[in-house]
Amino acid sequence: MRLLFLLLFSLGITCSYGDEVSTRKQILVSIVPYKFLVEQIAGDTCQVFSIVMDNHDPHNYELSPKYIEKIRQVELWFKIGEGFEKTCERIISCKQVDLAANIDKITNGACCQRFLSFDTHTWLSPKNLKIQIQAITEALVETAPEHETLYRKNCSLLQSQLDLLDQKISSIVSSTSQRNVLVTHGAFAYFCRDYGFIQHTIERANHSELSPKDVVRVERTIRDHNLHSVILLKHAGKRSSAALVRKFNMTPILLDPYAEDVFNNLLAIATAFANL
């Protein structure tokens, strides 16, 4: 795993952080959906880097020493409460903004990380994103006040787009009769809360193999709610659900909660949920 991160560093991260002549502010986010959001607000006034790059599982992410040295250079860090952030907190001295601070959090009963008290997938909700975009904007204005007009204009545009997105998602799922969703990994609690779904999770909280009791629990859920599809996540829980998919002849649907373009990803999630 460590060799993989060093390889990624040598192939791509060096180029990103090696731009010594740039006068743009260097901004750090924890996962790529927030890279997308910060770039939408900041435009080309900032360089935005993500701790966890695309195609990696944030729940099992490890930081290489060289990568840690590189992220010391940033001037602002937008955090979301993920477990791997604790490693960075000890060595990053820049201003840190907790984007989960003002969110109505869902307790972590069905999510993934035992050491966290809440579900960290807060970006999978247009309502949450409106709060977080405002927090991002205020922090950017404080960091680069010369661009305040641009930041506030882009923030207002994003807020309007989120209102439209919320309406579109509501329309997509409005006629859906199946409101129970079986997922390999509990990533969709906020989306479910916003749009009237109930999330049932296959995976155990500690990522361990399913016990016989777990299998019975999932089988009962499938029967009780007449479920015919299961949501597989790009980075989590696919192995534990494979046997159940075969046994019950279920339709697998692959989603990626960590896709960079969070707006289009929310539409993809809505479409998937509407066709269960």
Curated annotation (Swiss-Prot):
GO terms for biological process: cell adhesion; metal ion transport. Part of an ATP-binding cassette (ABC) transport system involved in metal import. Binds a metal with high affinity and specificity and delivers it to the membrane permease for translocation into the cytoplasm. Its main location: periplasm. It comes from the Bacteria. It comes from Chlamydia trachomatis serovar D (strain ATCC VR-885 / DSM 19411 / UW-3/Cx). A divalent metal cation binds at H59, H121, H185, D256. Residues 1-18 form the signal peptide. GO terms for cellular component: periplasmic space. This is Putative metal-binding protein CT_415. InterPro entries: Bact_metal-bind_prot9, Lipoprotein_PsaA-like, ZnuA-like. Pfam families: ZnuA. GO terms for molecular function: metal ion binding. Belongs to the bacterial solute-binding protein 9 family. It is found in: Periplasm. Keywords: Metal-binding, Periplasm, Signal, Transport.
